[in-house]
UniProtKB/Swiss-Prot annotation:
The gene is rpmH. The keyword Hydrolase does not apply. Gene3D superfamilies: 1.10.287.3980. Belongs to the bacterial ribosomal protein bL34 family. It comes from Methylobacterium radiotolerans (strain ATCC 27329 / DSM 1819 / JCM 2831 / NBRC 15690 / NCIMB 10815 / 0-1). This is Large ribosomal subunit protein bL34. Transmembrane segments: none annotated. It holds the Pfam family Ribosomal_L34. The keyword Iron does not apply. GO terms for molecular function: structural constituent of ribosome.
Amino acid sequence: MKRTYQPSKLVRKRRHGFRARMATAGGRKVIARRRAHGRKRLSA
């Protein structure tokens, strides 16, 4: 059985990156919550 996590920088950016978050209302809420919490890194 292969491992479930097969790292890829491109897929990581496309699925969890800043622009992917900003593309949906829910994603924008995620960014807003992380900003409010004072996160150093907002997205992948």
